[in-house]
Amino acid sequence: FNRXSPGLQGVSSVPLRTYADQPIDADVTVIGSGPGGYVAAIKAAQLGFKTVCIEKNETLGGTCLNVGCIPSKALLNNSHYYHLAHGKDFASRGIELSEVRLNLEKMMEQKSSAVKALTGGIAHLFKQNKVVHVNGFGNITGKNQVTATKADGSSQVIGTKNILIATGSEVTPFPGITIDEDTIVSSTGALSLKKVPEKLVVIGAGVIGVELGSVWQRLGAEVTAVEFLGHVGGIGIDMEISKKFQRILQKQGFKFKLNPKVPGATKRSDGKIDVSVEAAPGGKAEVIPCDVLLVCIGRRPFTQNLGLEELGIELDPRGRIPVNTRFQTKIPNIYAIGDVVAGPMLAHKAEDEGIICVEGMAGGAVHIDYNCVPSVIYTHPEVAWVGKSEEQLKEEGIEYKVGKFPFAANSRAKTNADTDGMVKILGQKSTDRVLGAHILGPGAGEMVNEAALALEYGASCEDIARVCHAHPTLSEAFR
């Protein structure tokens, strides 16, 4: 949060309040405290705006910190350690363990403590930067007014010059299947299962589906993912990478059923669930029994009951709020960022938009290149990409060249005995400019940031090749 616009020094002197009966006056009121909202609120305060942030949940941080990115990464990391110790991996390295036991309760405790520390960190940053935190459901009750309604029915009115909607997204419901967060779960329930299911069926093999499926597969569940799209990894993934990724996951024990539809699921008297799967082309219809059904068919913008209709702000066909390049809605002092606007539903995209949006309010330049926003799947191996895929380049008629390097030929990957995957760079044929980077392998989520930097700076493939990389490192494969 160090970027500052000229002539906007100092911070707000508004004292911290979590709730008040008297009306509050603000320069900027942010609705939502997820990665986009809390970052925007802090930045606004640092730029000298009197800032209020409204959050409907008890804890700050939104989906990402509480029931998304953060807890899932804790479970992915710890389940990977268990998988290494429980399988043959440690023995092959000369580490012999007589007995490995899973303490799921302890694993969940570690996840929760990480979440608690990070959400508490936001509260500390709010206090440090004089951001007023109001707990309640934010409703825009006028062009310059937001009303926050608390769980007990009491309300707080905020008079404000600018309003920033950062309410994020929610799980997309599946027609005909009711989520109870017990045996039929969304990503939220899948992060807090009380025991490892014998059989887990995942509807959707996108980013969230393969990540959470991997967690429980490593801990001992038999996992089957059913994906209508016909490929693994969701939208945006390069197809060559997707096919290799699927093969690696299958080798780990993950099962996939691609192309079929799921018309519904039925709970049996013994508590098990029968998942109906329609016939895919060339296949046959079947019923897959499971202990837990995880529904991962994506997320939708959270825009209900915000008061948008009353203000004349209409949503697009996908439920998103239309904005201009400065993130303004049709009402110039009401802005929107993150999952409620167009673009990938990613925490880091929302963060960037939040900072840039408030800098724009302060008179600064507003620019974001969505082609430089990286995506990561935090399985093992990881998958990461930024820029264009081969499929996109073909569709756009851009002539390109491909550079590939397998981790099997990388010294560090060899010494780590972790050689699955490859690095794939796409460059423009005529100019040598980097157009996209696709990484499947250990540390892909870290390495992709080098690619994002190259894209942002307009680097050529030769520019990257001429940068001296330390040896032996995994990132040499990128060069």
Swiss-Prot record:
Its EC number is 1.8.1.4. Residues 1-19 form a transit peptide. The active site is at H471 (proton acceptor). Homodimer. Part of the multimeric pyruvate dehydrogenase complex that contains multiple copies of pyruvate dehydrogenase (subunits PDHA (PDHA1 or PDHA2) and PDHB, E1), dihydrolipoamide acetyltransferase (DLAT, E2) and lipoamide dehydrogenase (DLD, E3). These subunits are bound to an inner core composed of about 48 DLAT and 12 PDHX molecules (by non covalent bonds). The 2-oxoglutarate dehydrogenase complex is composed of OGDH (2-oxoglutarate dehydrogenase; E1), DLST (dihydrolipoamide succinyltransferase; E2) and DLD (dihydrolipoamide dehydrogenase; E3). The modification Phosphoserine is found at S269. The lineage of its organism: Eukaryota, Metazoa, Chordata, Craniata, Vertebrata. It catalyses: N(6)-[(R)-dihydrolipoyl]-L-lysyl-[protein] + NAD(+) = N(6)-[(R)-lipoyl]-L-lysyl-[protein] + NADH + H(+). NCBIfam families: lipoamide_DH (TIGR01350). This is Dihydrolipoyl dehydrogenase, mitochondrial. The modification N6-succinyllysine is found at K50, K88, K106, K116, K127, K143, K150, K257, K261, K394, K414. FAD binds at residues 55-64, 73, 138, 167-169, 339, 345-348.
